Amino acid sequence: VLDGTELPQYKGDVKTMSGYYTDPVNGSKSFTFSGAEVDVQGTSSQYYARKNYKIKFKGGFVDPSGNTQETYKLRPDSVPTNTFTFKADVASSEGANNVELARLYEDTCPFRTAPQKQDSRIRQGIDGFPIVVFWYDGENTSFIGKYNFNFDKATPEVFGFAEGDESWEIL
């Protein structure tokens, strides 16, 4: 649940929000948060009615025991980070299959990057899992949609980026 008076409407329209994530399978993975910077993610997809949200959890993650962590692990074998994307996958019908295909590739690809040879948790492809997102505006709670809770593509620690590396997006 994203908690704030309004959601970001376009890339660069950053909102500071609080909220919570409830893991329906493993309650210990649930968390609350405050002071998160929420922005629209995606250059072309920012114009869709259903937005992708890049979230920088600046205030950390408060676990069910009340402990605050600066980073969060999507899975037990993941690299912890504090920036994630809630991806709507509006333009494609694959939805969570995008993530599952990337996981299959990750598991079967015989080629490893130099960072992966040093740390097997480093990824070449995206990872995440399906969630539903709601927005609480201070008065009402609205269903936003089915999303994927993904690593953000610009998290250097997840993908093994190093100082001087460049990442290009061709449109």
Predicted regions mapped to residue ranges:
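Phosphate/dinucleotide-binding and metal-coordinating scaffold of catalytic cores
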Residues: V1-L171
